Amino acid sequence: MKMFMHHIYEFKKGVRSLVLCTMCRTCASIVAERLRGQQIGYMIQEVSEKKVNLYFGKQECLDAVKTFIHKPLNRLSPEEDLMLGAMLGYDISMQCRRYCDRKSMRQATA
């Protein structure tokens, strides 16, 4: 829960525009209640019977994520993966390398 509170702090300070947490369903319901109380937008993606991905942040980012949330993260296109990583604040040069690697693999198997 400490990590979650830190993510809220970073979001409110403008350090992050989007946060992704994978957690059990029970924790997600507690977290969702707290986000609603602070009027922070969020959405939940089913991962398994016991786990969910909880995204929260700026509405523009959540709207973009909604365009591909209907599939598991390991099924994202290289472009969707790059976009999500950038929105989550991951190192952009590493994301670009990951994009190029995934794009090359996809072209090699096509």
Please annotate each region the language model reported.
Residues 1-110:
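Domain-length accessory/inserted modules outside core catalytic folds
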